Amino acid sequence: MLPNYSDTGPGAGALFQYALSRFKRMFTMALKATIYKAQLQLTDMDRNVYADHNVIIARHPSETDERMMIRLLAFALNVPADDKQGNLEFAKDLWDVDEPALWHKDYTEQIRQWIDVGQPDDKRLMRAAGRAERVTAYSFSSSTPVWWKAIETKLTRAANLVVWQIEAAESQALAKLAERSMQLQVTVQDGSVWMSTALGSVDITPRRLTASS
């Protein structure tokens, strides 16, 4: 239910219209999204993170199985060990360009990590680098080398940015594991990821494109 802004003085009308537009956007998203659920059992020996997560993804009508599963991979690789400094959440980038695919906000709404998937342009990544403590991007298309060559030199000032490449064959194999309800096991060791469901398993080795600091 929307708050009543009708008697709050000057500017109340604009405030109400803003609240109404936000409500409509959220309502439209809820109507069009397809809900996917994953019970994710994570064993990350590289980060010493061992946890079970019940993940709910509101999938945009235009999102492919491949992209959705890359978001799940990104969640597994970045979810913090605890919630003392906030949570990593799936965001609404396909509905709202001002949001990433996932983000980790602390309890003051500070963006601790911004995660994009796909091939964002350099301007988007630089804006994200100015808003968040850390920015991570995962590209999974066969055209990744071309995309990266075009923007690499434009990102040198973004010291808090890390870009990863997922080989197209690996992301396509991962897409075949997608189901509306999944029980997903993820093991991370020495930079390699093993993801398994009832439909099969996939080995993934993300390759870092940005230079190590």
Language-model regions: role of each:
Residues 46-94:
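Acidic-basic catalytic patches of nuclease active cores, encompassing PD-(D/E)XK
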Residues 147-201, 206-207:
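Domain-level recognition of nuclease-like catalytic cores that cleave nucleotide substrates
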Residues 124-128, 150-151:
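A short acidic, amphipathic alpha-helical/loop segment
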Residues 91-93, 105, 115-118, 138-141:
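Short His-Asn-centered micro-motif
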Residues 30-47, 185, 194-210:
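Mixed-charge (Asp/Glu-Lys/Arg
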Residues 114-116, 134-139, 162-165:
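Short hydrophobic alpha-helical runs that function as membrane-insertion/retention elements
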Residues 102-104, 109-125:
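Conserved catalytic cores of phosphodiester-cleaving nucleases, focusing on short active-site segments
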Residues 1-28:
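N-terminal amphipathic/basic-hydrophobic helices that include classical n-h-c signal peptides
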